[in-house]
Each structure stands twice: as structure tokens, then as C-alpha cells.
Amino acid sequence: MSCCGGNCGCGSGCQCGSGCGGCKMYPEMAEEVTTTQTVIMGVAPSKGHAEGLEAGAAAGAGAENGCKCGDNCTCNPCNCGK
């Protein structure tokens, strides 16, 4: 079985394809799967504060922290499933 379906995962910040961050993204959960539900109740900040974060995340979707995903995965360390 290839790592994350053959997606490239570089460092802690790169997430390529299907939102996967690479091999052993959560090593402590490799053997068991648990489900947790969290309910947060409170007051959220106005939309204006979050818009900058969303725009920044969209801009770095293809290459993040020097990671180029796909056939030419270039980063250190690079974890590409074959």
C-alpha cells in the first residue's frame, strides 16, 4: 500500500491531494482509529478577521514551505509514496 495513496507529504505544513500531510502524519494513531466529537459554544469573531487567513491558505495550495508536489516532489525531507 502506498503512502497516502501516492500523495506527496513534505514537512509538517505541506498537504497535497485529499488533504493528506504525508506518511505517518499521525504516528500515534497508526494502529487504532477513534472518533471524537467536540461541541464548542461561544461567540465567534466577525468574518473580516478570518478572510485574510482563507485567502492565504488558498494561495499556497500547490506549493507550501518549498514543497512541490506531484511527479517532481522537491523538499527536505520528502515523503512520496510510490
Swiss-Prot record:
It holds the Pfam family Metallothio_2. One of its GO terms (molecular function) is metal ion binding. It comes from the Eukaryota. Expressed in stems, leaves, rachis, inflorescences and seeds. InterPro entries: Metalthion_15p (IPR000347). Induction: By sucrose starvation, heat shock and abscisic acid (ABA). Not induced by heavy metals. Keywords: Metal-binding, Metal-thiolate cluster, Stress response. PANTHER family: METALLOTHIONEIN-LIKE PROTEIN 2A (PTHR33543), METALLOTHIONEIN-LIKE PROTEIN 2B (PTHR33543:SF33). Belongs to the metallothionein superfamily. Type 15 family. Metallothioneins have a high content of cysteine residues that bind various heavy metals. This is Metallothionein-like protein 2A. It comes from Oryza sativa subsp. japonica. The lineage of its organism: Eukaryota, Viridiplantae, Streptophyta, Embryophyta, Tracheophyta.
